[in-house]
Amino acid sequence: MKRIADEELVREERAEESTQKWLQDAKFQEILGADSSHKSLFVLLSHPDGSQGILLANKSPFSEEKSDIEKLLATAQLQEISRNDIFGSYNIEIDPKLNLLKSQLIYPINDRLIAKYRQEEKFVIRETPELYETVTRPYIEKYQLNLNWVYNCLEKRSEVDKIVFEDPDNENGFVLLQDIKWDGKTLENLYVLAICHRHGLKSVRDLTGDDLEMLYNMRDKSLEAINQKYGLKTDQIKCYFHYQPSFYHLHVHFINLKYDAPASTTMSAILLDDVINNLELNPEHYKKSTLTFTRKNGDKLMEMFREALKN
């Protein structure tokens, strides 16, 4: 077992070295977008080998640990901007270790990933069950992003160190793991994903009353695991689906209620408890309802809806 663990460590170190080398050789190409409210920047990179990548850079939230606050105060260098009586405005330089960027590097990438992160004007789509069958389902079957990374997580071929909890049952089980946007330490922006083991469920559209046992299981065991590992209570956690989701294998988002996570308060977020309640009242709710979401201008699904609604 030790030999296997050592080999895994060597593979991870080589992968990190390869990624570091790729980033060092890459050149800035374009700013795809920025989000001032979340202190995020999406940068398109080009590499001499012809490949492209996207760097997603996010400023980490402040730690509330006493030792970190004391270190911040001890290292702070003030640069005065203005002063009026007792009120002063300053730029402050602090220890770089207290001002890290939480980042994600995606490479090599294709045009669909570039389009995903490029900021464009958004529009509302009202998707009837008929439009789901004639527009959205064909879109998913033809254009959905590769799910290999999801299967790697479910089968423990990667990101094993990020697993918080697992129920291995093939029908109602799931893996609960740290989202790539979370550093695994700062509770203020806790973000974990519950990914179901069962294949074939793409989104809330596929859910019926027959799936309630799985949803109860994912909700209750995830909240219990978060409480046991991180100390957050049930009423401090927001759990929700995205529709449309970023990838089409059923998963639930769990975040600290304090954290204003990207797309957690938009039209794309549907609370897990609301999904459960709707299916308890009507087992076919998501098969028969019109679902509303937003899509960016130039997005392929947006184009397909516009074309369908012309006719």
Swiss-Prot record:
This protein's GO CC annotations: cytoplasm; nucleus; P-body
In which organism is this protein found? Caenorhabditis elegans
Please give the Gene Ontology molecular function terms for this protein: 5'-(N(7)-methyl 5'-triphosphoguanosine)-[mRNA] diphosphatase activity; adenylylsulfatase activity; RNA 7-methylguanosine cap binding; sulfate adenylyltransferase (ADP) activity
Instruction: State if Nucleus is listed as a keyword.
Output: yes
* Annotated EC: 3.6.1.59
Q: What is this protein called?
A: m7GpppX diphosphatase
- Cysteines joined through disulfide linkages: none
Q: Which residues bind substrate?
A: 159, 181, 242-253
| Alphabetical list of PANTHER family matching this protein | HISTIDINE TRIAD HIT PROTEIN MEMBER (PTHR12978), M7GPPPX DIPHOSPHATASE (PTHR12978:SF0)
Q: Motif Histidine triad motif located where?
A: 249-253
What is one GO biological process annotated to this record? purine ribonucleotide metabolic process
Activity regulation reads: The hydrolytic product 7-methylguanosine diphosphate (m7GDP) efficiently inhibits the decapping scavenger activity and acts as a competitive inhibitor in vitro.
Signal peptide location in the record?
none
What is the purpose of this protein? Decapping scavenger enzyme that catalyzes the cleavage of a residual cap structure following the degradation of mRNAs of the 3'->5' exosome-mediated mRNA decay pathway. Hydrolyzes cap analog structures like 7-methylguanosine nucleoside triphosphate (m7GpppG) and tri-methyl guanosine nucleoside triphosphate (m3(2,2,7)GpppG) with up to 2 nucleotide substrates (small capped oligoribonucleotides) and specifically releases 5'-phosphorylated RNA fragments and 7-methylguanosine monophosphate (m7GMP).
Q: What is the lineage of its organism?
A: Eukaryota, Metazoa, Ecdysozoa, Nematoda, Chromadorea
